[in-house]
Amino acid sequence: MDDLPPSLVVDILSRLTDSADVARCRVASKTLNSLTREVRSLNLLCTLSRYLKSRSPETKDHVTPFKAIFNNLVGQAPCLNSISIGVDKSLRNISYDDVDDESDDLYLTDVGFVKEWLPKVCGDLGKLSISDFWIQSCWRKSQILSLISSCCNGLMELEVKNAWLSVDGLNPMTRLTSLTLEFIRLEDEDLNKVNECFPSLQVLNLVGVGGLKDPKIHLLHLKSCLWTVSNAPLSLTIFAPNLVKLRLKCIKPKSLVLDTPLLSDFHLSVEEASDFRVKEFHNLGNLHLESSSLCCLLDMFPSGKSVRKLTVNSLKWTATIKFRLEAVFDVFPNATYLNIGPGAWCEAENCFRKGGLEDRNALKELREIVANLVVYDIEVTLSFIFSILDKCTKLSDMALLFHPKGDYKLARSLIPRCTAYCPRVKWRWGIREGPKDTWVSVGM
């Protein structure tokens, strides 16, 4: 290591995923010790094993406090442009009964703690991430946003997780382009302060943010947004004229208003929306819809002539809900790719069993289908698939996904009959396993 160019060594040290290794390097080599002052990135994570050792009577006296390690590392690296400090996700499983109520050794959004190190590095800091220990932070309201906004004029990316945040004293941060708040209790019920103080945001991620009442996102430069909302807010509004990618998950808002004319990639998961108002999407190419009332949502959706790639699913399937596959093409007539989730498939197959599949010209434009099957009666399922194949004359690819706990014998008997019925189609079948499906056979 001593023979490497200093610039390369600094780059290697800056890329370490755990900056505790940087401290070990300082002890191992005089050269490394001198070069650590030029490190540009600092990442320190409190692991579950470290936490347990710090609590055990046998080992706690031999464990250096986490905050002390961090302060020492910051003091040895004054040129930092990226800082990430947090607790490992495994600490979420720690019980409240196992924690001293007055402990603050892992209360990382404590303003007193942050004041010890932030002023030393704020001049060059471009990215800051703090992931707090919820058990210690949930009952302590933090003024850290005010401190960060007063110190870090050049900050471009900010991420805070697992904390109770006040917006009192928050100053505008005009250079901040990316903000992530995850599992946060936020004292900004309408998001007015977020809109006012972060006007240049291009990326906004709000995941499990509580304390919201009537939130409105009003950001002129926003391009990408992830927003998962609890059932508390009665209305949700997004005004973002430059937004191109939106992933929105909510429960039952009485009002959902979207003014996002440039949206091209949209994932919407909503149990029910009484009032869903959107302006027509002229650029929307990729759409993912999930709802407990899929038919009602489709009825409220504006014409989606630009949509080419479409995914639909029903969150809570019941036999009384009537979702016809043809209804999709009344709203999205130019879709060439269709992914049908298991709930939507059940509803559509149930409607087919009662009344068949109506002709739609748009069905003839479909090129690819991914069907997440739930097979109750193999003959009904086959009849539904065959009817789809008859109507979709330009279909070239069809994938059938089965439940991982399903009947493999059923699947193996269904596949040969499908391929024999329509050999012109390229067939695939596989198993649904979380976000990534397992393909058992490709190009049958």
Annotate each predicted stretch with a short phrase.
Residues 343, 371-374, 391-393, 400-405, ...:
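Short, loop-centered acidic/histidine patches that primarily coordinate divalent metals
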Residues 121-128, 153-154, 333-336, 390-398, ...:
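Structural alpha-beta junctions
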Residues 119, 143-152, 169-176, 192-199, ...:
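A structural signal for leucine-rich repeat
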Residues 426-444:
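C-terminal region signature
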